């Protein structure tokens, strides 16, 4: 196990983090390049996405918190300042979905998923450094989501809105998704950053939001017959429940456990542990004899998407 730990640390530092520092840093326009293709070619004119930049912010902040290397602090600060200066909507709140290579707003919609990742990144930077500005930004984004994207009538979080927080026709995260106003994926990546923010900002209002999100997972998103998590819903939480996503199942089983641990409530932890064991067992249905995990099961027609996508593995 110790050898595995050292091997993984070596891959993290010398193959992953080092690559992003030396290959993807945009020295001309700031931040990081928006695209490197499959042939390892940088595309300097590519747009820059909020999710990618927020994930960079989280990754280098977490790396610095654990490993304390100054180059990770520099990369984290670079990402923090770029997201702050170019993605934050200083007029309406929230963050833009994308900017052009120069840092000008491109797609200004408010995708709740992306705002969640920004909270994740800024809260991790605050956790790693004690930086008050990063914490203040994370708190402000939390309030933006709660004010504009939380549906108090039906419960849950709206998938996307316009820049001014008005209804938007196309709420999809990507072209392959159903156009539902509620998705499991977005709720997963709201409970994740809320949990991280709670580590550095323990307030009753945030705790209430997190507990409600746990209830949404157990009462709305969890299929009590299969113990898979269903993916797409409308405002009234009606959905087809026709897709089983093994990667999301195993991801959720870990993240929900992490949330329960951070809350520190033994009763909640006991309840969550019983459920996530069943979710993890359901995810095992996607495993194949070579140890890989296929992507999805479409219950309509009983077909499998046999792709082995990296994040699922």
Label the model's feature ranges:
Residues 1-313:
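Glycan-recognition and catalytic cores of secretory/periplasmic carbohydrate-active enzymes
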